[in-house]
Design a protein with these regions (language model features):
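Non-ligating segments of multi-cofactor redox enzymes
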Residues: 1-210
């Protein structure tokens, strides 16, 4: 492998508009229930009732922010390691792909991935996931999600170059700790972002949103 392609996400700029989700779903003609890119809202804190004014509540450490997440095209992908038929491979540019001609639909990769990236297509009987828009990448074009982000909160490029430009943060809540799979991701944290594994908040997105 000569390089490692990666995504960049600016949590301080994301407005939770889900344009990236829609672009991904449209470009890949994904069925209902399958979203290769998901926007997850995370929040916490408390609203404390005013003891003297009924109906009045005061915020206490209230926060919320959104994460746009897809397959992380990890440097140590557990999905590939778990596949019993060798149906998941990394290209020379680090992009992780599922060979659906080999896939037997056992779903081991789904259970192994801490990001929930591989998703089972019930009708086709095989696993699916983000391809980094490899077809567009090979033409020198942007992934659909990156191109669709109106806030320019998404970017892509070689991992080393993204780290040099944006820093080396690669995990904030609610994402898992990065040392599990070494995700090819760089994040500019939201001002209220919490370190993975130490969060006091919870995912507040509705299931149908993800």
């Amino acid at each position: 492998m000569t390089k490692q392609m990666a995504f960049y996400f600016d949590a301080s700029a994301c407005t939770d508009c889900k344009a990236c989700m829609a672009a991904c779903k449209d470009k890949n003609d994904l069925p209902v229930g399958i979203n290769w890119r998901r926007v997850i809202k995370y929040g916490g804190g408390q609203w404390i009732p005013d003891p003297e004014n009924k109906g009045l509540w005061h915020p206490s450490n209230v926060f919320t922010y959104a994460i746009s997440a897809a397959c992380m095209h990890c440097q140590s992908p557990l999905c590939a390691a778990s596949c019993p038929v060798g149906g998941i491979t990394k290209r020379e540019d680090g992009v992780v792909l599922i060979n659906q001609d080999k896939c037997i639909g056992c779903r081991y990769c789904e259970w192994a991935c801490p990001y929930g990236a591989p998703q089972f297509d019930e009708e086709a009987g095989v696993m699916t996931k983000c391809t980094f828009c490899a077809d567009l990448l090979d033409k020198g074009q942007k992934p659909a999600c990156v191109d669709a982000c109106v806030m320019r909160a998404l970017d892509f490029g070689e991992l080393d170059e993204l780290r040099a430009k944006y820093g080396d943060v690669d995990a904030i809540e609610p994402l898992p700790k990065a040392n599990i799979t070494e995700p090819s991701l760089v994040i500019t944290p939201h001002r209220d972002a919490q370190v993975s594994g130490t969060g006091t908040g919870r995912i507040i997105s509705m299931p149908e949103e993800m």
